[in-house]
Amino acid sequence: AAFALPAFASFEKDVITPAALEAVLNRKAPLSNIMMENDAIVNVIANVKTVISNPVLEEALLKTNHGVNGIPCGESCVWIPCITSAIGCSCKSKVCYRNSLDN
């Protein structure tokens, strides 16, 4: 993960993947049919995190740390805490991870 982390620092904002964003939205309002609520949440998150699609980065993080930090949640936490904490993720080494032993 050491080679991937400096790339995070080059962004002006932390990053989050669409999959992580969707997981947070489903956790916050799993039965909500009101798209406006989700749109508002997405707009707030987009102001503090850059939404990126980069499964290669997630795979690289998982392979390089050999699961020591847990499962990558698809979000960085260089400047802003993990939004994915709503789904059990926490910040370790500037990347949000979920404990691999948690269900």
From Swiss-Prot:
This is a cyclic peptide. There is a cross-link at residues 70-99 (Cyclopeptide (Gly-Asn)). Residues 10-69, 100-103 form a propeptide. Pfam families: Cyclotide. Disulfide bonds join 73-89, 77-91, 82-96. GO terms for biological process: defense response. Probably participates in a plant defense mechanism. Belongs to the cyclotide family. Bracelet subfamily. The presence of a 'disulfide through disulfide knot' structurally defines this protein as a knottin. This is Cyclotide vitri-A. It comes from Viola biflora (Yellow wood violet).
